[in-house]
């Protein structure tokens, strides 16, 4: 197939309108590379159709991703999750992949198959019509049975070895059928949490864990290596003890000039559990002062300050004022305490780098790298990737996960890393404290759509220190009696009149 002839591009590159960021990036890469080869512009077009239009039966097109063209759909029917193919179908060239990493691979495979001769007006580029390249990059995703029905979106690499299949326009029948398909494929259902409109299940099998979430007319299936944590099972979790449980909202050393050494904001929560162990949410910024505040509070509250055990440390998101203290604490205090578990859901660096509406995202990538480096310094540390619908049980405390970055796919729907915050509720002695991190308006909307009245809490941390991101709608569903405001007084005074903050203060 003659892609370039006489120095002019014969073929155009077509991507899926409304497709994934990875698909668009791959299409752009193909068009840009071909343009560089032939020193001419290559047309890049979406597959969108106007009312009454149909795709032409023939054309000189390089189809990238899950386009609406029949040739693309035929190629995808042959692919398992986590796989890719490059081939010709008639006169069209098809780059197909069930995965964001996989679609990137198709561009390399396609370009490697091209034969280029001549330069300038003599340039000729040929793709062999009988060529077929296939492969699988994720054996974990490939182990999943295919979902029948709904509107397939993509397979996403969501960080820490997890892969997520997203199918939109799903219904209860599609979800039920897929749960049966997982069982038939050799996965054993171990946990199911349901309410009037949502179904969350956890499976084990083949050395993998599979989480399914049917909510808001979308079916998400997440697979990763490993087994389910003991704290997901009430009868296997740490038992309650006789120590009086409490929660401490730790004051941080705030710098009103915000000069980078300390902060106007941050979040540090410590629960003492009934077995004498602790849970921590975030902890504060990347400085020795905040790390010492956390350690000193643990010592003050511990039944035995020489035997401090942290049952779980939650990191809401990879921003330095929340997660930075984990690095400093690891550096200074890991030999003085026992840390059993780290619970978080940090997207891939590629995802974080794709967030364009926040000048801090380069630091989010650095913070993520630092966290993962620090994880390796703790002996025997269990790392749990939190997913919506997860419940954990630790010494009389019940933790429910409401939103994570998982809820913001397809595509890069989050505008900042703030919206990737893990939002979770901790219930002790019948009282629930909702931890919101820096969740943005998009995450708030997803939480309300899925959870509604289940968000009701006795207390909550105000979103993003009172800065942008919160919505009055979200706060109306939480409807707390007590609000914890993790910010310096000067920031509180500057933001208290904002509509969502005024709602909390006046309701």
Stretch-by-stretch model annotation:
Residues 21-37, 169-191:
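Amphipathic alpha-helical segments
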Residues 341-343, 347-408, 414-418, 482, ...:
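Binuclear metal-ion centers of metallo-dependent hydrolases, dominated by the metallo-beta-lactamase
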Residues 265, 287-288, 318-324, 349-352, ...:
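Active-site environment of divalent metal-dependent phosphoester hydrolases
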Residues 1-12, 129-168, 222-231:
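Compositionally biased P/S/T/G-rich terminal and signal peptide-adjacent segments
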Residues 14, 61-64, 93-96, 270-272, ...:
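Structural recognition of the beta-strand scaffold that forms the well-ordered cores
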Residues 276, 288-347, 450-467, 479-484:
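Active-site metal-binding motif and surrounding structural segment of the metallo-beta-lactamase
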Residues 1-136:
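Solvent-exposed alpha-helical segments and adjacent loops
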Residues 230-308, 385-456:
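Core dinuclear metal-dependent hydrolase active-site scaffold
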């Amino acid at each position: 197939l003659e892609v370039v002839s006489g120095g002019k591009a014969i073929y155009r590159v077509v991507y899926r309108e409304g497709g994934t960021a990875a698909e668009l990036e791959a299409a752009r890469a193909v068009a840009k590379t071909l343009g560089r080869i032939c020193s001419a512009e290559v047309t890049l077009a979406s597959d969108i159709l106007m009312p009454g239009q149909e795709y032409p039966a023939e054309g000189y097109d390089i189809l990238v991703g899950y386009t609406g063209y029949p040739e693309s759909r035929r190629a995808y029917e042959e692919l398992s999750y986590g796989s890719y193919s490059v081939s010709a179908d008639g006169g069209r060239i098809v780059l197909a992949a069930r995965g964001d990493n996989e679609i990137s691979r198709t561009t390399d495979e396609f370009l490697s198959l091209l034969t280029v001769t001549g330069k300038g007006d003599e340039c000729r580029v040929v793709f062999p019509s009988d060529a077929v390249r296939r492969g699988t990059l994720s054996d974990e995703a490939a182990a999943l049975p295919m979902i029948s029905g709904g509107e397939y979106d993509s397979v996403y690499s969501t960080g820490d070895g997890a892969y997520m299949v997203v199918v939109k326009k799903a219904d209860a029948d599609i979800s039920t059928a897929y749960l049966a398909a997982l069982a038939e494929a050799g996965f054993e259902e171990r946990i199911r949490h349901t309410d009037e409109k949502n179904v969350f299940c956890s499976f084990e099998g083949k050395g993998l864990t599979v989480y399914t979430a049917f909510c808001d007319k979308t079916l998400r299936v997440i697979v990763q290596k490993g087994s389910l944590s003991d704290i997901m099972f009430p009868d296997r979790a740490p038992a309650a003890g006789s120590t009086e449980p409490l929660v401490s909202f730790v004051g941080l050393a705030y710098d009103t000039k915000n000069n980078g050494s300390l902060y106007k904001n941050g979040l540090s929560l410590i629960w003492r559990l009934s077995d004498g162990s602790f849970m921590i949410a975030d902890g504060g910024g990347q400085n020795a002062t905040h790390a010492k505040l956390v350690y000193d509070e643990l010592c003050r509250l511990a039944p035995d300050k020489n035997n401090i055990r942290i049952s779980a440390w939650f990191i809401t998101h990879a921003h330095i004022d929340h997660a930075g203290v984990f690095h400093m604490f690891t550096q200074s205090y890991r030999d003085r305490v026992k840390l059993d578990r780290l619970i978080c859901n940090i997207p891939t660096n590629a995802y974080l780098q794709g967030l364009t509406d926040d000048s801090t995202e380069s630091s989010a990538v650095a913070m993520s790298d630092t966290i993962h480096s620090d994880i390796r310094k703790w002996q025997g540390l269990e790392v749990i990737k939190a997913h919506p619908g997860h419940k954990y049980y630790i010494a009389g405390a019940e933790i429910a996960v409401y939103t994570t970055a998982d809820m913001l796919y397809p595509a890069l729907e989050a505008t900042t890393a703030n919206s990737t915050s893990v939002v979770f509720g901790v219930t002790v002695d019948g009282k629930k404290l909702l931890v919101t991190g820096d969740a943005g308006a998009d995450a708030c909307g997803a939480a309300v759509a899925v959870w509604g009245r289940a968000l009701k809490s006795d207390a909550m941390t105000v979103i993003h220190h009172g800065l942008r991101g919160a919505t009055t709608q979200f706060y109306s569903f939480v409807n707390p009696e007590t609000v914890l405001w993790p910010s310096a007084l000067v920031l509180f005074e500057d933001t208290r009149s904002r509509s969502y903050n005024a709602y909390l203060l006046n309701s």
